[in-house]
Amino acid sequence: MSLKLDGKKLSLEIEERLNNYISSNKKIAKRAPGLAVIRIGEDPASGVYVNNKEKACSRIGIKSFIFHLKDSVEQKEVEQLIIKLNSDKDIDGILLQLPIPKKFDEQKLISSINPGKDVDGLNEINIGKLVKNEPAMRSCTPAGIINLLRSQNITIEGKKIVVIGRSLLVGKPLSLMLLNLNGTVTMTHSKTLNLNKVCREADILIAAAGKPNLVDSTFVKEGAVIIDVGIHRLKSSNKNQTRLCGDVLLEDVISKVFAYTPVPGGVGPMTVTMLLVNTIFSWQKQFGLSSTLNDLLP
C-alpha cells in the first residue's frame, strides 16, 4: 500500500509546537508576532487563501493584519503601504497575496518588501541568497514540500528528482533548495521533449505544472515518490457540483508509487504552515529569542 504524505496532519502537529514556542517567548518580546497580508482585487480563490492564513495565524497566536485593496488602487499607493509596513515594528512578515491584477508591476512590489519581512521568500535578495545557499527566508511551498519529505525520512541527497514547472513561486526555488540538499535535479516545463520519459527517471517526481491530471502512470516509475502541488476545481459529472483535483491523476498512479501527497490535504496546508514559520523566524530574529525554532520542524 502506498504511503500518504498527510500535509494536514503534519501541519497541525507543527502548529501546536509553534503555538507553544510563541507562548513561551511572548513575555520576552512583549508582543505577539505580526503578519500583514495585502490582497488586491476580488479574486475568489485569493479570498479563500487569505481567510485560511488568517485562521491559521489565530490558531497559534500570530496577530494578522489584512489589507484588502480595491483593484482601482494605484501602484504607487500599494508601494507606499509596503514602505509603511516595512518600518512598522509590530509587523514581522509582509505577504502580497498572488495573483494580483495584471495592471500592477508584481515584481516591483515584491522587491519593495524588506527582505527580512519577505515571508514568501520572493524578494530578489532572498532568491539570491538561496542561489548562494546562504540563510534567508525560503519560499513557503518548496519549504513545505521538503518538510513533508523529511517527516517520513524520505532521502533527498543523491536522489534523481524531476520538477515539472519553472514558476518563481514553486518550480525555480524548489529546484534550488533540492540542489542545495544534494539532490540530482531536473527542471522540466511545457517545452520539454518527451516529458513523460524524463519523469520516469525520477525517484521523486514533483508536479507543479498548473495543469489538471497531467501526470498519469506513463510518467511514473515503480516505487517513486510523487508530490502534487496543483489544485484545480473542475466540474463533476453532476453539472451542479465541482470537485478538487491536482496535477496528478492519482487513481492511475497510486498502485505504482511508494508515497504520494493527496489533493486537498497534502502540500497546501504545509504552505500555510511554512508562512507561519517564516513570520515567527522574523519575530525571533528581531528580539533575539531562543534559536530552537528549527527544532520544531521535521
UniProtKB/Swiss-Prot annotation:
Keyword terms, alphabetized: Amino-acid biosynthesis, Histidine biosynthesis, Hydrolase, Methionine biosynthesis, Multifunctional enzyme, NADP, One-carbon metabolism, Oxidoreductase, Purine biosynthesis
Molecular function in Gene Ontology: methenyltetrahydrofolate cyclohydrolase activity; methylenetetrahydrofolate dehydrogenase (NADP+) activity
EC number: 1.5.1.5, 3.5.4.9
GO cellular component terms, semicolon-separated: cytosol
Residues annotated for NADP(+) binding in this entry: G165, R166, S167, S190, I231
GO biological process: one example: purine nucleotide biosynthetic process
Catalytic activity: (6R)-5,10-methylene-5,6,7,8-tetrahydrofolate + NADP(+) = (6R)-5,10-methenyltetrahydrofolate + NADPH; (6R)-5,10-methenyltetrahydrofolate + H2O = (6R)-10-formyltetrahydrofolate + H(+)
Pfam families: THF_DHG_CYH (PF00763), THF_DHG_CYH_C (PF02882)
CDD domains: NAD_bind_m-THF_DH_Cyclohyd
SUPFAM superfamilies hit by this protein: Aminoacid dehydrogenase-like, N-terminal domain, NAD(P)-binding Rossmann-fold domains
Pathway: One-carbon metabolism; tetrahydrofolate interconversion
NCBIfam families for the chain: PRK14186.1
Record text on subunit structure and interactions: Homodimer.
The family this protein is said to belong to: Belongs to the tetrahydrofolate dehydrogenase/cyclohydrolase family.
Function: Catalyzes the oxidation of 5,10-methylenetetrahydrofolate to 5,10-methenyltetrahydrofolate and then the hydrolysis of 5,10-methenyltetrahydrofolate to 10-formyltetrahydrofolate.
Protein name as annotated: Bifunctional protein FolD
Annotated source species: Prochlorococcus marinus (strain MIT 9215)
Classification of source organism: Bacteria, Bacillati, Cyanobacteriota, Cyanophyceae, Synechococcales
Gene: folD
